[in-house]
């Protein structure tokens, strides 16, 4: 049995200092019935907690660390920037370098604005969509999480789902009434919503792969249908690629599925582990953002040199060949997890998109939030705790997916499959 004495003591202290002892709810590990692990360091595919336990890491800071922990090139870039100055409140050339890479690789982006978080990116994109169209309502999908902006915390997934809360108190009714929600992968409901409210729908915002109800890919024709419906009704299509951006493919989710939105939100990978976000799209739309247009958005640390340098060094190491290797590794892990579950007769459904994998303990195919909620949460919690004992660090929520990095080796994946085999053999009874 692993020892967690130091983590337990640190969490006891933290609960007097921060709400729930953490700075983001899912880190409290409530849904898996254990105290959170306090991490001390990471290198490559491994993390180490303050009690000295080693884990193969599939959280990767919730997705950003696509090259694993403490990537040598990213670390050297950060050292060089820190020695010259961390922020100036003025433009720097590294902003141009990262912006060029983003524009080159993301089909929908002709102009990009850097911000400080994924939430900031989605909030800013919604304001832009409303300002550009002159309309008020937005359409989002049940269980899709787009950050903690008020208008987006309506039937959200991810942390809200993990806590078992339908919505967040504090969201005004006046805000909520302008948010239309329909089931993910249900194109007919989208069409009906446009029949009812089409003249006032500014945009549809969607994760190309719903990553905050587990991992739920789009059904064939769903994204194409959204593109068609929005174009027919004069609304903008926004892809929230904070999670999928540069994660599922070299050209992001939109390249993976061949559907180009009007606006795209990015985060996670483009910051290489530092706080970052971005939104971009057609030049005609983006030129409406201040100072070139009237739609205001600003940020004290937007485009700061540390985040830009980490993001640039992260992206330049990603090539089309990187994603071929991601597919191979992810297929290997997916097949191993499925074989272990089948061997022990455990109800399961596995979804995958690129290097994102979701395992649901249910017999039901998971194509939307209702199906994801059919998972056996008690079994997941027990499975999670046993995987920790086996030295594997997974996201502590049924409604979050696993992430792979370039640092994960075949040996890591084989060890993870072996750990899952042990965990499932213990739990099958």
Swiss-Prot record:
Its cofactor is pyridoxal 5'-phosphate. One of its GO terms (cellular component) is cytoplasm. Disulfide bonds: none annotated. SUPFAM superfamilies: PLP-dependent transferases. It catalyses: (S)-4-amino-5-oxopentanoate = 5-aminolevulinate. Pathway: Porphyrin-containing compound metabolism; protoporphyrin-IX biosynthesis; 5-aminolevulinate from L-glutamyl-tRNA(Glu): step 2/2. Signal peptide: none annotated. PANTHER family: GLUTAMATE-1-SEMIALDEHYDE 2,1-AMINOMUTASE, GLUTAMATE-1-SEMIALDEHYDE 2,1-AMINOMUTASE 1, CHLOROPLASTIC-RELATED. Homodimer. Belongs to the class-III pyridoxal-phosphate-dependent aminotransferase family. HemL subfamily. This is Glutamate-1-semialdehyde 2,1-aminomutase 2. It comes from Bacillus thuringiensis (strain Al Hakam).
């Amino acid at each position: 049995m692993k020892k967690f004495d130091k983590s337990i003591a640190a969490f006891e202290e933290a609960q007097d200092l921060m709400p729930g002892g953490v700075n983001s709810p899912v880190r409290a590990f409530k849904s898996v019935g254990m105290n959170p692990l306090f991490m001390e360091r990471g290198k490559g595919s491994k993390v180490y907690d303050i009690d000295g336990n080693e884990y193969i890491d599939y959280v990767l800071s919730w997705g950003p660390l696509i090259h694993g922990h403490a990537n040598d090139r990213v670390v050297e870039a950060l050292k060089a920037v820190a020695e010259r100055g961390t922020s100036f409140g003025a433009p720097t050339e590294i902003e141009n370098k990262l912006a060029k890479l983003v524009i080159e690789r993301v089909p929908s982006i002709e102009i990009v604005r850097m911000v400080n978080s994924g939430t900031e990116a989605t909030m800013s994109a919604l304001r832009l969509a409303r300002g550009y169209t002159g309309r008020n309502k937005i359409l989002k999908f049940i269980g899709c999480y787009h950050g903690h902006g008020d208008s987006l915390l309506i039937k959200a997934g991810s942390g809200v789902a993990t806590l078992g809360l339908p919505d967040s108190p504090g969201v005004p009714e006046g805000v909520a009434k302008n948010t239309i929600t329909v089931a993910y992968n249900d194109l007919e409901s989208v069409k009906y919503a446009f029949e009812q409210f089409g003249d006032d729908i500014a945009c549809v915002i969607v994760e190309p792969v719903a990553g905050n109800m587990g991992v739920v890919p789009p059904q064939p024709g769903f994204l194409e249908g959204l593109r068609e419906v929005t174009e027919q009704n004069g609304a903008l299509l926004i892809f929230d690629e904070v999670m999928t951006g540069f994660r599922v493919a070299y050209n992001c989710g939109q390249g993976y599925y061949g559907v180009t939105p009007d606006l795209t939100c990015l985060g996670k990978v483009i910051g290489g582990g530092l706080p970052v976000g971005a939104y971009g799209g057609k030049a005609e739309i983006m030129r409406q953002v201040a100072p070139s247009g009237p739609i205001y958005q600003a940020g004290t640390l937007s485009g700061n040199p540390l985040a830009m340098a980490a993001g640039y060094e992260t992206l330049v190491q990603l090539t089309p060949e990187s994603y071929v290797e991601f597919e191979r590794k992810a297929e290997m892990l997916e097949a191993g997890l499925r074989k272990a579950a089948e061997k022990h007769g455990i109800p399961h459904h596995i979804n995958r998109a690129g290097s994102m994998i979701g395992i649901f303990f249910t017999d039901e195919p998971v194509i939307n939030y209702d199906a994801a909620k059919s998972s056996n949460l008690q079994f997941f919690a027990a499975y999670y705790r046993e995987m920790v004992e086996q030295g594997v660090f997974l996201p502590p929520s049924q409604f979050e997916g696993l992430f792979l990095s370039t640092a994960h080796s075949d040996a890591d994946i084989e060890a993870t499959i072996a750990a899952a085999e042990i965990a499932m053999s213990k739990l099958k009874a």
